[in-house]
A protein has these predicted regions:
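Amphipathic, hydrophobic secondary-structure cores in small proteins
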Residues: 16, 21-53
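C-terminal structural segments of small proteins and small subunits
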Residues: 43-71
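Residues in and immediately flanking transmembrane alpha helices
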Residues: 2, 31-33, 71
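A charged helix-plus-loop insertion that forms the helical arch/lid used to bind
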Residues: 74
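Short, Lys/Arg-enriched N-terminal segments with co-localized hydrophobic residues
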Residues: 1-13
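Low-complexity intrinsically disordered segments
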Residues: 10-11, 23, 66
Length: 74
């Protein structure tokens, strides 16, 4: 079972989750996101929550484009 494999690695397994999103989220939303990502990553991978790292990256709409158009122009 894959979960046991991760458990056997112990502290050597330190998953890092990166979440990128547009600016404008509240501190509460970001806190809830970090908690949920941490909890679910630990559950699925079978590691301790203390070993999960989460990095949030807020991006300005002019720096994020879809189909060649910055979101600030949509």
């Amino acid at each position: 079972m894959q979960k046991k494999r991760f458990e056997q690695q112990g502290e050597k397994t330190m998953p890092m989750i990166r979440a990128e999103f547009l600016t404008g989220k509240t501190q509460e939303q970001k806190r809830e996101l970090v908690e949920a990502l941490t909890r679910e990553t630990a559950r699925v991978l079978g590691v301790r929550e203390q070993s999960v790292w989460v990095v949030l990256q807020e991006v300005e709409p002019e720096n994020w484009a879809v189909a060649g158009t910055p979101l600030s122009e949509r």
